[in-house]
Amino acid sequence: MLRITNQQQIDLLNGNVQRIQRDLFRVREALASGKKVNRPSDEPIAFEQIMKFRNVLNNIEKRSLAVSEAASRLNLSESAVGTAETIIQRAKEIALQQRNDTSSAAERQAIAKEVHQLLLSFVDAANTKINERYLFSGFETQTAAFALSSSVSASGRSPSISANDDNTGTTSATVSIQTAGSLTGNKYAITFSDSTTFDVKNLTTGATVLSSQTYTSGANIDFDGLRVVLTNNPSGPLGGDEFQITPHNASDATITASVSTASALQPNVYEIRFTSATAFDIVNLTDNQVLSTGNSYTSGANIVFAGITAVITDGTVTPQAGDLFRVRPNYSYQGDTGSIAVEYEDGKTIASNVVGSQVFSGPDVDLLNALQNLEQALLTNTPSDLSTVIGNFTTGLDQLTDARADIGSKVNRLDRLAEGLDLLAVTTQDERSTIEDTDYAEASSQLATLETNLQASLLTLSRQFDISLLNFLR
């Protein structure tokens, strides 16, 4: 029979006390920290699972933040496109109002000031930033999407022809320079007394140029250096129909222009006005300011002003007094076509930006150019140019509407992704909590049991120690 000595009993009881004390430490630590697994040694398998859950939660948090930032970018982008849409709608209303012949040059120049502000507001919308980063520049987020930098428009005041709004026939009309040396630069009207007879009148001088001419569809109508061709489309003109030819240069000199100092460019319309065959003035039409007067003209020489270099070259006829040449810097896209992708799941991404060249300057219409064309047409009192502008605005509004719809669909998708990530985070957190977090009711019960067991073990140990000591003293 195995005999257990007093010392062995004491050692067993002491080991039991130490085990209970270790368990008490773990339970008290779990109650204090709220975690029942605090180190790998507590539960190695559970600790490994907890670390995996933490990594998953970190990835979810990063993706949720990226999705949230993407939604913010797209929401602001949608707002900017909406602002642009409102601007273009107003610009179209102005173009429709000013296309008629009832507005005076002064009235058109006055309304051009509003158009200029619309242009600047449109540029601001296209150059919207979030967190100091441009929204519509692709990957080039530190570069403004649109700026005056490299493109300049330049043209002489060439003749153009337009049908009166109240014409009842359907006739196409073109005008070109036939003999530059015979040009007067004046305004003309071709008026039909019936479907086969017309007169040509110089509206500037009041003189009749051609009288009782017989109309033939597609035939040349030549006068004062101009050639007009009227063509049935599909029917011909009717009595009372009228076609007007705008004032134009009396020469066929041409102009080109380029940027000389980009930092000096302003979004203005400039006019080079010839006061004689050898001298010209330069006027800022936008601000109605004369930049210089009495400049000496030499064919092919550089004309430098406001960051622009213009060159006028003689044709068969040198520029004449009254000839006008218009110059303006144009806005152009400065970004790239980069798509900023956001990963919402392993290997799956969604674009979080829209490219300005596919919203404001394309894919169908360059709306900044259309706004500049509207302003120039009003400043130069050429309502015949407004029909093209109106058509561009109509197409451009569809372009902006399509862009808003595309952005809206992306925002909706991001909202759904955010909801999915939130749900995944909650589910993962619950699973982690089941393994890691303290069950306070269970732990409190364990604490009470262990404390009772400890007291009992200590009492037993004490008694056994007393017995051992008494036996020793005997």
Question: What residue spans do the PLM features occupy?
Answer:
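Alpha-helix initiation/capping motif
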Residues: 5, 43, 148, 162-165, ...
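Amphipathic alpha-helical polymerization modules
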Residues: 1-147, 151, 372-474
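Polar, low-complexity export/assembly segments characteristic of proteins
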Residues: 24, 28-31, 35, 130, ...
